[in-house]
Amino acid sequence: MRGLLAIAAAVIVVFAPVSAFAAKVSKSEIAQSLSSQGYAVQDVGPNTLFVRVADYDIRIDIQGPDGDISYRAWLFEVDGKDVSYKILNQFNNNVKFGRVYIDEDGDVTLQMDRNGAGGSSIANIESDFDVFLMLISSFMDHLESQIIA
């Protein structure tokens, strides 16, 4: 009985990473999908794409064995010195799927992540990218409302 359990456990361990890897969306699939939507996509490294949308360069990183996706945009038109932590925290508390912060260079940075565990599809990536674009707009609206108020 113990022998059968050991064999079953070994089979699960051996094949589990394969199924997770199979669910990973490749960088080239992401690039092709976003390019087909009219976005300017640039391959800048083994796991990184930059996508130009209006005035923003959005960095997409594909990380880890499950293909976790990280979207980041640096909002260079916003001076980090002019944005209080109160404004950042208000936005971060209201938006649970993204976050805005001031990076080590003083740049205002917006980030959103997708955990690849369980798999993701091109449709998920396209949807996430649209959500990230809305998140940028939402933060800029939030910032404007705080400055005007």
What label would you give each PLM region?
Residues A6-A16:
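Bacterial N-terminal signal peptides
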Residues A16-A22:
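Sec/Tat signal peptide C-region and signal peptidase I cleavage site
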Residues A22-D68:
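N-terminal secretory signal peptides
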Residues K27, A31-L34, Y85-L88, E126-F129, ...:
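Extracytoplasmic/secreted envelope proteins and their assembly/folding machinery
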Residues G45, V53-D55, I62-G64, A73-E77, ...:
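A mature extracytoplasmic/lumenal domain signature
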Residues R72-Q111:
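Short, internal acidic amphipathic alpha-helical interface segments
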Residues G118-A149:
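C-terminal partner/receptor-binding element of secreted or periplasmic proteins
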